Amino acid sequence: MSDPLRELFDVIEDRKETMPENSYTASLLADDEKGENAALEKVGEEATEFLLAAKDGDTDELAHEGADVVYHMLVVLAQQDMDVEALLAELDDRR
């Protein structure tokens, strides 16, 4: 079984290292205020869209927006030089 959370985080970390010019992820990871603010704003925006999809009972959109929330949250973790393992350990502690 694959581990999509770790795999996605690995891609984000790769973009952080290589900073490809036309990468959306790299633009969010830019070492400037614009990049940091953009990633934080996207977490809020996508969380709002997730909540609205839940309110509307739209399960397809809920899955889509949930994935967007998780992706942007992982970008913020990478910005903060955290590893996805810290998040997974916290989740594991809550079981």
Swiss-Prot record:
What SUPFAM superfamilies does the annotation carry?
A: all-alpha NTP pyrophosphatases
**The reaction(s) this protein catalyses:** 1-(5-phospho-beta-D-ribosyl)-ATP + H2O = 1-(5-phospho-beta-D-ribosyl)-5'-AMP + diphosphate + H(+)
The similarity annotation says: Belongs to the PRA-PH family.
InterPro entries from the entry? HisE (IPR008179), PRib-ATP_PPHydrolase-like (IPR021130)
Q: Which domain of life is it from?
A: Archaea
Sample GO molecular function, one term: phosphoribosyl-ATP diphosphatase activity
Q: What is this protein called?
A: Phosphoribosyl-ATP pyrophosphatase
The disulfide bridges present are none
Keyword Metal-binding among record annotations: no
Matching NCBIfam families: histidine_hisI
HAMAP family hit by this protein: HisE (MF_01020)
GO BP of this protein: L-histidine biosynthetic process
Q: Which organism is it from?
A: Halobacterium salinarum (strain ATCC 700922 / JCM 11081 / NRC-1)
One Gene Ontology term, aspect cellular component: cytoplasm
Q: Where is the organism placed in the taxonomic lineage, from the top?
A: Archaea, Methanobacteriati, Methanobacteriota, Stenosarchaea group, Halobacteria
Tell me its EC number(s), please: 3.6.1.31
Q: Report which gene this protein is encoded by.
A: hisE
Q: Which UniProt keywords apply?
A: Amino-acid biosynthesis, ATP-binding, Cytoplasm, Histidine biosynthesis, Hydrolase, Nucleotide-binding
EC top class named in words: hydrolase
